[in-house]
């Protein structure tokens, strides 16, 4: 039985710059958004819904037995979209934790989604996200790979200090590839979307730095691997290859 205090929201829109229409791209016989929806449902942690500004996406989700909520087309980020969806789906405020699961993670595992929950046992934690250790120089140097920099507070847990597209931290020791899945306390999400974009957020083009600069606590759980995101046509072909074998 899922927990009514947890809401899993999947933002999805058709107007992606590098791969327009990607939520409905076919992967092994199903639209990509349906793969993500089913993995979120399999996690079994809370109510799951797709937040979209596109009636076609909402119709596909409904046709596959999922829940969709229509949101405005003008949102600057996925966080703003899930905030509107949260208000529509849960006006009574029963949901205490809101998870923002990217709609372009068709290979993410249910267990990976569950990993964001344990840190909320500490009431000081505002936001939880994920990262995986970097093992290749290519990953280490790529600006497209966001690095999570944090102080260890457990064997697989960091307290976030910074996020950057640069290679960081300097020197010997592990570096971590940030995974763009976020879980917010409801009050933290409310605060986050009320804040203006911050200087470092604009410089790095990383919205999580808005929370860091505002003094919000972000904990990072370390997972074994990075789920394959789909941003380009080659990414889509890779996802098709992986899921056609599963």
Curated annotation (Swiss-Prot):
HAMAP family: KdsB (MF_00057). This is 3-deoxy-manno-octulosonate cytidylyltransferase. Pathway: Nucleotide-sugar biosynthesis; CMP-3-deoxy-D-manno-octulosonate biosynthesis; CMP-3-deoxy-D-manno-octulosonate from 3-deoxy-D-manno-octulosonate and CTP: step 1/1; Bacterial outer membrane biogenesis; lipopolysaccharide biosynthesis. Its EC number is 2.7.7.38. It is found in: Cytoplasm. Coiled coil: none annotated. Activates KDO (a required 8-carbon sugar) for incorporation into bacterial lipopolysaccharide in Gram-negative bacteria.
């Amino acid at each position: 039985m899922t927990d009514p205090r947890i809401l899993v929201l999947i933002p999805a829109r058709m107007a992606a710059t590098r791969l327009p229409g990607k939520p409905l791209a076919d992967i092994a016989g199903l639209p990509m958004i349906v793969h993500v929806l089913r993995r979120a449902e399999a996690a079994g942690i809370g109510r799951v819904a797709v937040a979209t500004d596109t009636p076609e996406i909402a119709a596909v989700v409904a046709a596959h037995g999922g829940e969709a909520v229509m949101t405005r087309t003008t949102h600057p980020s996925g966080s703003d979209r899930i905030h509107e969806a949260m208000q529509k789906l849960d006006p009574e405020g029963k949901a205490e934790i809101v998870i923002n699961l990217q709609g372009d993670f068709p290979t993410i595992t249910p267990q990976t989604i569950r990993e964001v929950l344990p840190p909320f046992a500490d009431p000081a934690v505002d936001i939880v996200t994920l990262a995986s250790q970097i093992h290749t120089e290519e990953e280490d140097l790529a600006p497209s790979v966001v690095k999570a920099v944090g102080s260890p507070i457990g064997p697989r847990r960091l307290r976030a200090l910074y996020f950057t597209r640069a290679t960081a931290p300097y020197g010997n020791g592990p570096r971590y590839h940030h995974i763009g899945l976020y879980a917010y306390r409801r009050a933290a999400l409310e605060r986050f979307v009320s804040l203006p974009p911050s200087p470092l957020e604009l410089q790095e083009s990383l919205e999580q730095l808005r929370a860091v600069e505002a003094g919000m606590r972000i904990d990072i759980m370390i997972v074994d691997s990075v789920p394959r995101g789909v941003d380009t046509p080659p990414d889509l072909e890779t996802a098709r290859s992986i899921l056609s074998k599963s």
